[in-house]
A protein has these predicted regions:
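Short, well-structured N-terminal submotif of metal-dependent ribonuclease cores
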Residues: 1-40, 55-62
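Glycine/small-residue-rich phosphate/adenosyl-binding loop
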Residues: 53-73
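Short, high-confidence coil segments that cap the C-terminus of an alpha-helix
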Residues: 35-36, 95, 111
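Histidine- and aromatic-rich ligand-binding microenvironments
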Residues: 5, 40-41, 95-96, 118
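Acidic, metal-binding active-site segment of PIN/NYN-like and related structure-specific nucleases
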Residues: 100-128
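Acidic catalytic patch
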Residues: 16, 39-44, 68-92
């Protein structure tokens, strides 16, 4: 399973970086063709919505359109257990808490790949 980080979603909507936008479009297109292989975190959707509203100055209806498009994929909420695990991940890997929460949510949902530009290529993070 592949977990899609917030920045992939952001680049999908970003009109300023065509190269990263094309990569993001490819990832999301593959996710739409193979929805059983991908997971989005509810947190990532919230962060994406915030960036679209504040940074990209999109109106709420446009953001809803993006969310509707993405709603065909599995959406994973986070739990208290994920929050506790995120604290372990944050401490062990010196990551930001919300990045750690996404990683903990991915791990809890059986993901073996975390699609992001925030980690080093091939970096492996586990909370244990």
């Amino acid at each position: 399973m592949k977990f899609v980080d917030t920045n992939v979603l952001v680049y999908l909507a970003d009109r300023h970086d065509a190269g990263k936008r094309e990569i993001a479009k490819g990832i999301i297109a593959d996710a739409m063709r193979n929805p059983e292989e991908y997971i989005l975190g509810a947190q990532a959707l919230a962060e994406f919505s915030n960036v679209c509203l504040r940074k990209f100055k999109m109106d709420a209806d446009t953001v809803r359109d993006y969310l509707g498009f993405l709603s065909g994929l599995k959406i994973a909420p986070y739990t208290l257990t994920n929050v506790e695990r995120a604290l372990e991940v944050k401490t062990k890997y010196q990551l930001q808490f919300f990045d750690s929460l996404l990683l903990a949510t991915a791990e809890a949902n059986g993901c073996d790949t975390f699609l992001s530009e925030d980690l080093n290529s091939g970096q492996v993070c586990t909370a244990a």
